[in-house]
From Swiss-Prot:
It comes from Staphylococcus epidermidis (strain ATCC 35984 / DSM 28319 / BCRC 17069 / CCUG 31568 / BM 3577 / RP62A). This is HTH-type transcriptional regulator ArcR. The gene is arcR. It comes from the Bacteria. CDD domains: CAP_ED. It is found in: Cytoplasm.
Length: 228
């Protein structure tokens, strides 16, 4: 690696550290002594971040891009959770040995900083403000998961798709006054997989929402009216 490359990597890590410190509301100086234990990585679209959350020793802050986290239970059911930049994951790995089985995939090109799990646990024990922030983030994540799981209990297909779209607007959508924008990674097939209904049925429902002027396509992005 050349001197210029090393300088760029160092600057990249410094900038990522600032974003991490800002995200968990602490001075960047608290984190700097641990910089050598962390890394910044780029993942290409479709690349696996980790195959199983019980194998990863790090917690990640997603700096750019979108990811999908798939949780598998003992019955073989799959729950898919999507995230966009500025999310810390997997938080349910903290302070416990047995963790849910989860796989993480980059839906778009991504950039993230990895922090050792035991370092996060150490910082939580020694800095109350970090513990409070992470507890708040974990509670918010749990509420989002409950909302998604409740959407899956809807018996009517259109109601289920509509509720999942509302959930996606809150978790991966960008607020634009009267509508939310969901980036181009969203597809009929992915929405169908998340809803647990056929692609054909999902496509029919999406066409209905377009006719009702609730959902629009802008290039490859989805625009969802707040009247949904």
């Amino acid at each position: 690696m050349t001197g210029n490359q090393m300088f760029c990597r160092e600057n990249e890590l410094d900038e990522s550290f600032k974003q991490l410190a800002s995200y968990i509301n602490i001075p960047v100086g608290v984190l700097l002594p641990f910089k050598s234990q962390c890394f910044v990585r780029h993942y290409n679209k479709g690349q696996i971040v980790y195959y199983s959350s019980d194998e990863t020793t790090h917690i990640y802050l997603l700096l750019k891009g979108n990811i999908m986290r798939e949780n598998f239970n003992l019955n073989g059911d799959v729950y898919r959770y999507l995230n966009r930049e500025k999310v810390l994951f997997p938080l349910n790995n903290l302070f416990q040995d047995k963790v849910p089985n989860e796989m993480c995939t980059a839906l778009t090109d991504c950039e993230m900083i990895g922090i050792p799990r035991d370092l996060i646990e150490y910082l939580c024990k020694n800095h109350e403000e970090i513990f409070v922030k992470l507890f708040s983030l974990l509670s918010e994540t749990q509420c989002q998961h409950i909302e998604y799981n409740m959407a899956l209990t809807s018996k009517l297909a259109k109601e289920r798709v509509t509720k999942i779209l509302r959930y996606l607007c809150q978790t991966v959508g960008y607020d634009h006054d009267e509508f939310y924008e969901i980036k181009h990674f969203m597809t009929i097939q992915l929405l169908s997989d998340m809803a647990g209904i056929s692609r054909e049925t999902t496509s029919h429902i999406i066409n209905e929402l377009k006719e009702e002027k609730i959902l629009f396509k802008n290039s490859k992005n989805w625009l969802v009216s707040k009247d949904l």
